[in-house]
């Protein structure tokens, strides 16, 4: 949300002077794709891709509300948590998932790590379901804590990758898909773009996918 915030990031990673620096808007996924293309075209042999989010620089729920349609949605100030609540309610009413399944996700997360906010862990699903709603049907444990974070990945072309690592992980392809952001224009309980990407990536054999990370 802050103009030219990438400049401080370049200072942090020590790229002085940066040999070949490029920055993209939106998220690090686009930066990853740009670096991937540069490797494929032979412009570079290696690339450091990084992305970061600094939610503490502003009021995140207000910022995200201002990214919605300025005529029909933004005047209502629906923040991301409220819209996630709409999506959760649609899924519950349609029988796509249950409140117990939602609580199980939170319980599994608590078993792996503590949260960065004041939300306390629980020992059972019933304990979580007894907690009050924050944005019905969401409780605080259903909502990701607002935090600052960063991620990075090093890409290398074929021979260079084998030189740097005995068993490197390979990127086999990318799929670009998008769905309308207009509230009410699509079914919030399904994601056609995710389904189409999975089919394209596997040649239609989606059952071969062992692990998938899906985020929004």
Task: Give the residues covered by each predicted segment.
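Generic structural marker for isolated residues within well-ordered, non-membrane alpha-helices
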Residues: 6-7, 88, 198
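Beta-strand segments within the central parallel beta-sheet cores of soluble alpha/beta enzyme folds
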Residues: 1, 47-52, 100-107, 166-176, ...
């Amino acid at each position: 949300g802050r103009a030219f915030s990438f400049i401080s990031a370049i200072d942090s990673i020590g790229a002085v002077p940066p040999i070949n620096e490029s920055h993209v808007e939106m998220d690090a996924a686009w930066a990853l794709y740009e670096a991937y293309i540069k490797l494929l075209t032979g412009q570079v042999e290696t690339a450091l891709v990084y992305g970061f989010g600094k939610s503490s620089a502003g009021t995140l729920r207000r910022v995200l509300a201002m990214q919605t349609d300025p005529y029909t949605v933004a005047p209502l100030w629906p923040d991301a948590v409220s819209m996630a609540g709409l999506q959760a309610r649609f899924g519950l009413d349609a029988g796509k998932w249950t409140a117990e399944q939602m609580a199980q996700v939170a319980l599994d997360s608590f078993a792996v790590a503590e949260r960065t906010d004041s939300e306390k862990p629980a020992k059972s699903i019933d304990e979580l379901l007894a907690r009050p709603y924050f944005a019905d049907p969401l409780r605080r444990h259903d909502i990701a804590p607002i935090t600052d974070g960063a991620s990075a990945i090093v890409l290398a072309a074929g021979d260079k990758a084998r030189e740097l690592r005995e068993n490197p992980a390979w990127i086999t392809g990318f799929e670009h898909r998008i769905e309308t952001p207009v509230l009410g224009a699509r079914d919030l309980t399904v994601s056609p773009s995710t389904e189409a990407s999975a089919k394209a990536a596997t040649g239609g054999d989606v059952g071969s996918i062992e692990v998938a990370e899906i985020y929004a």
